[in-house]
Structure formats: C-alpha cells, structure tokens
Amino acid sequence: MEVCGDLKSDNLKNRPLTPLRILRGLMILLVFLSTAFMFLLYFAPIAALGLRLLSVQQSRKVVSLIFGLWLALWPYLFETVNGTTVVFSGDIIPVEKRVLLIANHRTEVDWMYLWNIALRKGCLGYIKYVLKSSLMKLPIFGWGFHVLEFIPVERKREVDEPVLLQMLSSFKDPQEPLWLALFPEGTDFTEEKCKRSQKFAAEVGLPALSNVLLPKTRGFGVCLEVLHNSLDAVYDLTIAYKPRCPSFMDNVFGTDPSEVHIHVRRVLLKEIPANEAESSAWLMDSFKLKDKLLSDFNAQGKFPNQRPEEELSVLKCIATFAGVISLTVVFIYLTLYSHSCFKVYACLSGTYLTFATYYKFQPSPGCFREDSCKVKNH
C-alpha cells in the first residue's frame, strides 16, 4: 500500500504552483544558495581549518553555532514560510545531546525534516547524517556536508565499514553533542524498489514489507558498536506526509506537503542487544513496526498518540533570515568591492574546500607534524 499517494480520506490538497509561488521559490533558491556559498567561503577556513588545528572539539562547537544558524533557515522555510504543519506523535523527546536517529526513507527530503526536531531541542548544528557519497559532489552543498562532517558511504560493506569505524571513532567523547542520523533502507522508497525488496525477502525467509524496504543492518550495527557506551538513546522515527510525499522543489516552491507526521519511539540503549545478530533482529522488528504504522496511517490519516510540540517562533524566523542575509551581503560587498585581499581569501577558501571535500581531508592538532590528517586516496 503506497503511503506517498494522495490520501483520499483527507481534505488536504497540494497547493497550486502559482506565478507568485514560482517567484518566491526562485528567490528562496537564490537566498539559500548565496548564503550557503558565502558562509562556507568566509567561515569554513576559520572554523573548520584554523581552529580545528588547535582543537577539534572547539572547532565543532563553532561550526555548530555558525552553520546551525544557516541550517535553521530550512525548518523556518518549511513551517513558517510555507505553512507546513509538523505533527509529532509517540514518545516525548527530552533534551538530549547524544542520540542515534533511525528513520524510514519515503522521499529525497526526509532527512531535512529531522532538522525540525533538532532545532526544537537545541541540537541543530550537531546533527550529522550517513549519506551516499555521490551527494558530496553537489556544488556548494557538498562543501557544507564535508564541513559538517557528514559520513559518506558507497553502500558497499567492504568499502563503507572502515570509513564508518574511522569517522565514528572521532565522535566517541560522551561530553560532545552528537545527533547521528541513519536511514537503514539505504535509499528512498519507490514501488519498484519495494517489489525488489519483497522478492529478496521471500528468497531469504524475511517478512514482506509493503511501506518500507528491508533495512541494511550492518551500518546500524557499526554505529552501536562504536557509540554504544556514549549515547543517551536511539530515536526510532517513522515519517509520513499529507497529501503526498514532497520532492525538494515542492519544498522550495511550497506546494507540498501540507502536513509532515513524525512518530517517535525513544529507545534506551539497554533495550537494544549489543550482539550483532540480535541487534539486526531488533532493527528488523523496528521496520516491521514502521510498516504497520504506515499502513494504519494510510487508513486513518494519523499516527497514534499525537502530542503537542512548541511552534517555531515567527520572530526568531525573521531574526534568523535577517542575520544570515545581512552577513551574506557584507561578505559579498567585501569580496566584490573592498580590498583585493578579500578576493584572494575567497579564492583560496574555495580551493581549500574543493580539495578537502574531494580528498575527505579533516585536519587535527599537530597533523602536519605527525602526518595524521585524514586524507583518502582516490
């Protein structure tokens, strides 16, 4: 049963793509791309290179503060500008600094709605994703993914496991905030992928799931193996949309979705087996539950145990947009109309970001003396 299709039982409809929405969407794209570009050019060499050579922990704090400000534009766009309602259900989320988030992958923008949770809990700048490595090649955003230390994977176990182990080992400090997001299905849901998943499930004796794909368990196992003793909890999230699943451009133009429903199951680490085989079985059970939740959502139009969450402040939205845009205007002025040293700085910064992203270069204190920087051969 396809949850991404229109829900006939609701009166919600996708908003029409009017000329005004097109104009507003193009302006939003311009604002988001230009602000991301200038923030990365001017802040990344200072926060993610210079400061990181002195202290990785302090560098991460500054990166979180600066780029968390920019990331906040997205939840404000979704909820305050577009008028999308985010409906939470299930367990209440306390303010916790170290969590592993696992979620179903309905569409290409699921991961962006996790920011709506992190913003409310004061951890927006600390959220990191395990994502497919091809996304690191995106112009501008690839730089951002690298600076924010997202973990790129090839979806090949023999290649990905050493990368996961290496990068996760740098996040083991229990005093350092970390929201690590993982989509165990490994790809977004489509009917064709679902049929292939069901065929494979039948061949290996696993349950046939209709609304999610079979999860890949090893990545989850590695995350638990490395971080088990330092995490506060696992947030098991199930995401659904009304009236249909949005694309990235739907979000930009504000046509879809009208509602995002996020069901939360907060699980303590002691409730998840440490043994790899048993933790894999736990994850499989989690996705069987997601499948049932999504079937019920399709029939009833909601998840059980809906609960209120604070609304995002309009004043904070205005202040965030004003602050980010004002800084961007200053950076553009410095680059184009001020002393030539700013042009040189911008060029060197862009060169460094391109190099660092391509070679997965993350500096650390003393790395040039001890040859300990993380650089991968291509």
UniProtKB/Swiss-Prot annotation:
Which parts pass through the membrane?
26-46, 62-82, 317-337
Q: InterPro entries recorded for this chain?
A: Acyltransf_C, Plipid/glycerol_acylTrfase
List where in the cell it is found.
Membrane
The molecular function terms of the Gene Ontology recorded here are:
1-acylglycerol-3-phosphate O-acyltransferase activity
Q: Which UniProt keywords apply?
A: Acyltransferase, Lipid biosynthesis, Lipid metabolism, Membrane, Phospholipid biosynthesis, Phospholipid metabolism, Transferase, Transmembrane, Transmembrane helix
Determine if Lyase is one of this entry's keywords: no
**One cellular component (GO) term of this entry:** membrane
Q: Name the chemical reaction catalysed here.
A: a 1-acyl-sn-glycero-3-phosphate + an acyl-CoA = a 1,2-diacyl-sn-glycero-3-phosphate + CoA
Regarding the membrane, this protein is recorded as: Multi-pass membrane protein
Q: In which tissues is it expressed?
A: Widely expressed at low level.
Spell out the CDD domains in the cross-references: LPLAT_LCLAT1-like (cd07990)
* EC number, as in UniProt: 2.3.1.51
Q: Where is this motif: HXXXXD motif?
A: 105-110
In the record, the note on similarity to other proteins reads: Belongs to the 1-acyl-sn-glycerol-3-phosphate acyltransferase family.
Write out the domain note: The HXXXXD motif is essential for acyltransferase activity and may constitute the binding site for the phosphate moiety of the glycerol-3-phosphate.
Return the protein name: Probable 1-acyl-sn-glycerol-3-phosphate acyltransferase 4
Give the species: Arabidopsis thaliana (Mouse-ear cress)
- What's the encoding gene here? LPAT4
